Amino acid sequence: MADNTVILDGSGVKRALTRIAHEVLEKNKGVEGLVLVGIRTGGVFLAQELAERLVEIEGVEVPCGAVDITMYRDDIKGHTEHLPVGKTELPFSIEGKKVVLVDDVLFTGRTIRAALDALMDQGRPSSIQLAVLVDRGHRDLPIRADFVGRNVPTSRSENIVVAFDADNKPTEVILQK
């Protein structure tokens, strides 16, 4: 059986997201022109949570969308017809916007690279910033997060899992050894 360690409990996750929300506001001098885009699946739920924090702080709703990266992944060689493809849902234009791309765990950077490609196919934002709940290191690509909830150095054989409840609210972050 895997040895599991809770890295962040529910209140720790909330504190991390609140801090990220404040950092996003500070860096962008408010919410004007700001949109949130979560990477399916975990990043979407975290983007929604981040949007709620921004409303609590600023009293203004920030548009929130989702990007699916299935067809942009670089670890798929042909035979893509059998892949479960999610849906990219951007109920707003990203043209000229400040996009905050949100994901649960940053590891090799390959998911983020795929998300950047998918976003650029949707338009040309003025900037793209990256917010992640956990950065575990081990990059294969030169990608770094602008906003990080928690840095958790891991070995390549370990895994980080962000758990969500039935309402898709993050409940804890677990290190699996």
Swiss-Prot record:
EC class name: transferase
Chain positions of motif PRPP-binding: 99-111
Entry keyword set: Glycosyltransferase, Transcription, Transcription regulation, Transferase
Pfam families for this protein: Pribosyltran
Family annotation (InterPro entries): PRibTrfase_dom, PRTase-like, PyrR, PyrR_bifunctional
Lineage top rank: taxon: Bacteria
Keyword flag tRNA-binding: no
Catalytic activity: UMP + diphosphate = 5-phospho-alpha-D-ribose 1-diphosphate + uracil
Stated role: Regulates the transcription of the pyrimidine nucleotide (pyr) operon in response to exogenous pyrimidines. Also displays a weak uracil phosphoribosyltransferase activity which is not physiologically significant.
Protein family membership: Belongs to the purine/pyrimidine phosphoribosyltransferase family. PyrR subfamily.
Cross-referenced NCBIfam families: PRK05205.1-1 (NF003545), PRK05205.1-4 (NF003548), PRK05205.1-5 (NF003549)
Official protein name in the record: Bifunctional protein PyrR
Organism (species): Geobacter sp. (strain M21)
